[in-house]
């Protein structure tokens, strides 16, 4: 159809070829049957052969990608938020957006009853709730901070690790931290308060022995390492930096404000606390659940020097 009129049609060429073969058969005295057989053999012998496909791996890959795309499109067609009727048929306590079935219409199809997809949906939701309880249930019941004064050893033994602990060490503990500060090699810059808190890269034996000559007096500290820093209050910058502490912290002098916050995953389930600390106060909080944040009041900012110890 698209070829020009001057180009001979393929059928015309084939007809001419058959006429030539037929005339050749007549010339050599062949019968009509022999001529037909001869023409058939010639046409079969000269039939064009298909070449093997090029790039077979590429072709197979393209077919696979197309098939996957079709399947995904089919899934997307059935994907949309559950209808109110469906949400009413499933218990509200078992619904969970993280379930792979929570936004798919499979739960409305007969196949859901055959393969118990509703049971899978409920199992997924319940397991997700159990994971939340495992991570944050330890702090959901914490309503206050346990304060210890004289009966340190007895109270600490009854203390659960998930409850923040305020230890009123008084002047003796404040003096020990101040002496550590005086013996340090760092230049003594003006400071509003001095803090001792935990890090994982510092040895703990010498620090704990200095602060607590009776090592069994506070067994909660035996697993923590420590460092000493001097902090001061300054005018607040446009974007004040937050100073966060993990584990435990001792105040040598000054009266900083400290907030105890649940870790990010537990902030919807656990409450936070605020403390005004005094010299000799020590705060302990499990770093897997809590973090401490220095929060000065007013238009001020906290800036801490590098570690002294």
Swiss-Prot record:
Query: Biological process GO terms, please?
Result: chromatin remodeling; epithelial cell proliferation; positive regulation of cell cycle; wound healing
Task: State which ranges are Cytoplasmic (membrane side).
Answer: 1-59
Please give the residue ranges for the topological domain Extracellular. Answer: 81-309
Q: Does the keyword Ribonucleoprotein apply?
A: no
Does this entry carry the keyword Transmembrane helix?
yes
- Membrane-crossing ranges are 60-80
Task: Report the membrane topology from the UniProt record.
Answer: Single-pass type II membrane protein
GO CC annotation: what is one?
Answer: cytoplasm
User: According to the lineage, what is the superkingdom?
Assistant: Eukaryota
Q: Where in the cell is it found?
A: Golgi apparatus membrane; Cytoplasm
Q: Which residues form a coiled coil?
A: none
Instruction: Name the keywords, alphabetized.
Output: Cytoplasm, Golgi apparatus, Membrane, Signal-anchor, Transmembrane, Transmembrane helix
Quaternary state and interactors:
Homodimer.
Functionally, this protein is described as follows: Exhibits histone deacetylase (HDAC) enhancer properties. May play a role in progression through the cell cycle.
Its name, as the record gives it, is: Bombesin receptor-activated protein C6orf89 homolog
- Write down the species: Danio rerio
